[in-house]
Amino acid sequence: MSLDKIMNEAISPWMKGDGPDSDIVLSSRIRLARNFKKYQFSTMQNEEEAKLIQELFKKEFINKTVEPFGEFELLKMNELTPLQRRVLVEKHLISPNLAGTEYGACLLSESEHISVMLNEEDHIRIQCLFSGLQLSEALQSANQIDNWIEKEVEYAFDESLGYITSCPTNVGTGLRASVMIHLPGLVLTKRISRIIQVIQKLGLVVRGIYGEGSEALGNIFQVSNQMTLGKSEEDIIADLKSVIQQIIQQEKMARELIVQNSSIELEDKVYRSYGILANSRLIQSAEAANCLSDLRLGIDLGYIKGISRNILTELMVLTQPGILQQYAGGPLGPEERDYRRATLIRERLRIEKN
């Protein structure tokens, strides 16, 4: 695995999967927060400690293979260009917070299922990504990597509290489980606000596609647990999965309602968006996201034939500003990005139809 390969292959292998409930659930993510016992939290640590953590991971973990994820490579943030950091964020491999750090790093698996962020809010954040609704499978893989790292690292752990983390809401299991879910039916029927209120009352958090502070582009929402103390990992996963399954049922009911009551209007909306995507010469990120959401809904409902449903996930990543500029070989102005975005979408749709 090389940096060039990571940068130039925008679609991570996990994105090409077709997991359970993938007509509505795009991906499942598990993140485990861990800290070294002997160092101050990242928010308080000095440059020397941050570098020592990097060096330990460089010595013990790079070029090592863990099946089925392949070999691991260490990417140091201060050795990457701002554009390269942005690409990693847009591929969901690192957080925007890590991208802005001087001594942050990322231990990345060849399959890109696993990303271990270093010197972010916590010393170590293990992230595991799977397609569809596969929270239990993602947790099992994250625990496998956690055990691998713990052989070389003494974690900050308290017998009564659990894992000690920088943010109090992560104390305990240190587990953050989240699901990326496509909810156009609930948005179109104007039920999404009520659903979000119910989700929040259950102690879960709803965010946009790139996490905290981001908007829900393309009717894609991220639902995650909030508290990690006082519950086992299995209970956290079970509770989140139960809520997600109820949201899936609500989304399916909303789609059925639209088809029953507004079928021709929905079909028109789908084909108008398809026409924009297939023919535009300039298209901005937000418009592309909304049109791709409509196209994906049309594919799921059988209006559009011969196009993979994975096209939403793929093109939502491929058409992000950083990845467009990476493919172009350097910075692009807004209009140049819109032109390249439109061209890429047209070409991708043409390949699908052929």
From Swiss-Prot:
Residues binding ATP, per UniProt: 27-31, 92, 125, 176-180, 207-212
Chain coiled-coil ranges: none
Short name of any one Pfam family annotated for the protein: ATP-gua_Ptrans
Top-level lineage group: Bacteria
Residue ranges constituting the Phosphagen kinase C-terminal domain according to the UniProt record: 24-254
Motif range (RDXXRA motif of the pArg binding pocket involved in allosteric regulation): 337-342
GO CC field: extracellular space
PROSITE patterns: PHOSPHAGEN_KINASE (PS00112), PHOSPHAGEN_KINASE_C (PS51510)
Gene Ontology biological process terms from the UniProt entry: phosphocreatine biosynthetic process
Activity regulation, short description: Appears to be allosterically activated by the binding of pArg-containing polypeptides to the pArg-binding pocket localized in the C-terminal domain of McsB.
Catalytic activity field: L-arginyl-[protein] + ATP = N(omega)-phospho-L-arginyl-[protein] + ADP + H(+)
Xref: SUPFAM superfamilies: Glutamine synthetase/guanido kinase
CDD domains: bacterial_phosphagen_kinase (cd07930)
Enzyme Commission number(s): 2.7.14.1
Annotated GO MF terms: ATP binding; creatine kinase activity; protein kinase activity
Family named by the database record: Belongs to the ATP:guanido phosphotransferase family.
Name this protein carries in UniProt: Protein-arginine kinase
Naturally occurring in which organism (per UniProt): Bacillus cereus (strain ATCC 10987 / NRS 248)
